[in-house]
Amino acid sequence: MKREGHRRSRWPGFFIFLAIMALIGLLVWLLPVFRLNSIEVPELRSLDSQPVIDASGLVIGRHLFRGLGGNLDQMAHLRYPQVEAKLLAAFPTIKSVRASLKFPGKISLAIEERVEVAYVSFPDGCVMIDKEGVALKIWQDEPQDIPIIEGVSATSLVLGKPLEVDVPSAMNSAITLMGAIIEADKDSRAAIRLLPQIRTIRPLTGSRLYLTVILPRTGEELTVLSETGQDQTEDMLWLRFALAQGSFDGRGKGVLDLTGSRKTFTPD
């Protein structure tokens, strides 16, 4: 009899527990603090915030727990993997995105954009690529502030994917060079950036490339011979400083050779 009475005494506590849990669930569902009331988008370089919000599928009033989770890492950081996937699919210029919950009532979109650093021309226009060779945009007019990669032709073009060309080794050499230029431009000591001064990149056989560089002070053209390798970033940094100091101003046309142990300028 005592055992039966003990069993019966457990039931009220169990029902109270269920009632409390149901009440908590109801509060979580109904309270405004668990509803989306703002979407945080950082200042973007090439995208407008409203199209990004529209493509995300997020709407004000949506419950914050809807779509939350995914794998363990995404759950631990309160992320929305479906929102991230939608944005990556909608915008080829987005390199990475993190959609995460921020109490109260906010979802933050942290977006890293790809930056166009060169382009490849084709009969109807050109395609701009980033430093990894990913196709970003198709334009009819050739841009003036980034270089053209000559000697390669696109064979397959899918925005958001690496551009496929007829000479992959040449494209790889150009991509390596662009990476070295971007690294050199991170140095804060020189007064000018190198990338905007480069008009053409033409890979040769092997690891060598020709660059056409515009001298910033005079507007003259300088042909530069470079070579992919561990010293290429240092070579590009040296070239950047030389341009800033006007080292080749007024010397006429010629070729600056950066491939040997000594940097030499040979007039035409």
Predicted region positions:
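Short glycine-enriched loops at secondary-structure junctions
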Residues: 44-47
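Charged, solvent-exposed interaction patches on well-folded alpha/beta domains
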Residues: 1-40, 50, 55, 63-66, ...
